[in-house]
Amino acid sequence: MGQSPVSLRLLSWLAYLGGGAVMVAQAVALSDGRQRVLPLALLLAFCSPYPVRFAIEGKSYALLVLLVALAWWWRRAERSVAYGVVAALAGLTHFYGLFLMLAAAAWDGASRRWHLAGAAVLGAIPALGWIIYSADYLFSARSGSWIGPPDFALLEESLARALGLWPLPKLLLLVVLIG
């Protein structure tokens, strides 16, 4: 296989398939035996444009989705050790995973599910340690130099992927209909 587009994206594809499978299994487990849940969950997990787009990139977004889906699975099963380990991996994969796990810890703490809150907080320690270790770089001007300035065209392109051509009038119509 060597260095090819396929080998570059293979991990993302596998993570996307794994994350989608976990999400579908979670939906079926929560469905209480309703027959339409499986095909709908399969459709949403494997035909949505956003996960498909992230699965074809050579980045860690699909891995983050897999880890967060596993974290929710173990959290629902109240398996604190597995939840904490996967929360740690999600936090180390992407900052969004860290903040999502900390939000879940706050929610679990407010709900007095101390074992789950503790597992998520303990799972956050490696990522918080990494942030402290790399703070000099993260807060320097050179850390975000590869990110372009905010651009209205990027917003419109993202909306067009979700809503189709001419997304702004459609979004305005949607806001008017909802409001």
Where are the language model's segments positioned?
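Membrane-proximal helix-loop-helix interfaces that form the catalytic/acceptor-binding platform
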Residues: 1-31, 36-179
